[in-house]
Amino acid sequence: MLLQGTHRIGRMAMLLALADENESPVLSIPKGWKYCTGKVGSMNSQKVVAAMETAAKSNRVIETDVYRETHALYHAIMEALYGVTRGQIQLADVLRTVGLRFAIVRGTPYDGKKEGEWVAVALYGTIGAPVKGSEHEAIGLGINHI
């Protein structure tokens, strides 16, 4: 059960999330892997989660009718949000808002087939008071098995 050096799922997700719209990260996505990217901004953490889940389903990164896939994605999203929010997934209640780019990557990072598929969610953007100029950069990464 070795993590393949060329199949670092979290690194790939982070590079995709960090890339600006006009730049393309130099990545070689392994054959059979799936990914999507997008943006979300809100004072409501439920909207942030829903936007990422919708993107993953509409881009066929996860199957819409398989509960364990949605469940794995949810936990990866929550882990990434913990990083962005420093462990407090409250936004509107404490007058915080986020503007994030996200990447969701699904693949097989281990050399053993028994380890199965994994999903990584990377978030990069800003968090702060809902006043322009009152935010700072933040980053989060969540990885979970499917």
Curated annotation (Swiss-Prot):
Keywords in alphabetical order: Activator, Histidine metabolism, RNA-binding, Transcription, Transcription regulation
UniProt record, GO biological process: L-histidine metabolic process; positive regulation of gene expression
UniProt-listed Pfam families: HutP
MF terms in GO: mRNA binding
Record's keyword annotation contains Transcription regulation: yes
InterPro entries found in the cross-reference section: Regulatory_HutP (IPR015111), Regulatory_HutP_bacillales (IPR023552), Regulatory_HutP_sf (IPR036482)
Organism domain of life: Bacteria
Family, as annotated: Belongs to the HutP family.
Main function: Antiterminator that binds to cis-acting regulatory sequences on the mRNA in the presence of histidine, thereby suppressing transcription termination and activating the hut operon for histidine utilization.
NCBIfam families per UniProt: PRK03065.1
Assembly with partners or alone: Homohexamer.
Name of the protein this chain belongs to: Hut operon positive regulatory protein
Species in which this protein is naturally found: Bacillus mycoides (strain KBAB4)
Phylogenetic lineage: Bacteria, Bacillati, Bacillota, Bacilli, Bacillales
